[in-house]
């Protein structure tokens, strides 16, 4: 079995019994052995951990780049929405976003950060988005392709 993490296919291998937890090492995902249902739960938890670390870092980097203040990043299990932004500056991202390529992940992060400037989807917002993510359409296509992989997790 393989999984997709930040756009890369990675093999899933059994973790040594003494490790007791999932981990990423040398381009492989190691999961403790268990039933299919247990492995699915472990894989989701692995994705959530990876998402929190990666997306928090990227959101902070992009926020600093744009001079935008954010109030934390939360990881959700949303299936229909990649991300959202609260009026108070909290960013929410689905852990499933971690399956997308890095440029598509950044496009979603930047999209949500632009809501800190323009809290709607007006023409002004779209102009900001286009200026800061010139390849937004290509990223949207990548995200649609990524969404096809949701069924098994």
Regions found by a protein language model. Name each.
Residues 1-107, 116-153:
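Active-site-proximal or metal-binding-adjacent scaffold patches in catalytic folds
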Residues 112:
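Walker B catalytic acidic pair
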